[in-house]
Amino acid sequence: MVSCDKFFGEELTDLIFDHGKFEMPDKALFIGNSLLLGNGAFGMNATDSTSDYHAVIQRKFLKANPAYTDTKLSGVDFEACENRAQQMNWLDNRLCPVLSEDLDLVVIQIGDNVNTSSKREAFEQGAKELIATIKAYAPRARIVWIYGWYVSNSVIKSVKNACKQYAVTLVAIDGINKAGNRSSIGTVITRVEPTSQSLNYTRYTVLSDNRLQIDFNVGGKKYKAIVQTESYSDNTEAKTLTWQGYETITTDKDIASHPGNNGFEQIAQRFFEVLNID
């Protein structure tokens, strides 16, 4: 029985079905896009691996059930599919190998990158195929769909139709995408693995403990950030710093449009709210 489903055009709203009290899972699968794995091992643009929506949800589940485990699967290639053959290839070769009968929960968090007419046309049926495949190979799993930080009318319709057909709970997060919940240029990200970054600077200062304070411009605006480095080099002619270490600086506006830590916290809280998880 749908208890919350208001259709005004293609407004994105929660879909809540009566599946009984939410039982804390033993084993879960998260299928997501950049909000799950965009910063390598964690969601873009959380400042570290403990601050994205998955980490917040995982902590609550582990507190209730220390034996809880989960797996993360990138769904960006499924979002990119332009026909059914491509979708079935992904379902068969990427999704099915990680599905199992002992899964208690599958969280889907895709749809934001379905951004061309051919992708949207394919996704209309693909969203249903995705849920059907999960139900076939993980029959015990409760399925929850989280959408959408970035939205389009056609994808809203496809996601809602698929969720309605299979009685899948839909958690709407579009209302969270606003100032204060997004990341920002200049945000420092701590990676799980060491990496390197190059950045054109206006000036920089070497601080203690191998830290660099870097002043730089993006789009005519001035920014300042401090990063911990393991080593660095300076191309003085090009005024370009290159450093190695675990920390990077957000310099791209599209990356900065993703959730920041506060946005991810609110996404997780919406998940708990819709599923009535204390």
Locate predicted features:
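Short hydrophobic segments within beta-strands
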Residues: 31-32, 146
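A short helix->loop->beta-strand "cap" motif at the edges of active sites that frequently abuts
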Residues: 68, 137-142
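Conserved SGNH/GDSL esterase-like catalytic core that processes O-acyl groups on lipids
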Residues: 27-29, 37-118, 154
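Histidine-centered active-site loop/cap adjacent to the catalytic His
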Residues: 195-278
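Charged helix-capping and loop-helix junction motifs
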Residues: 122-129
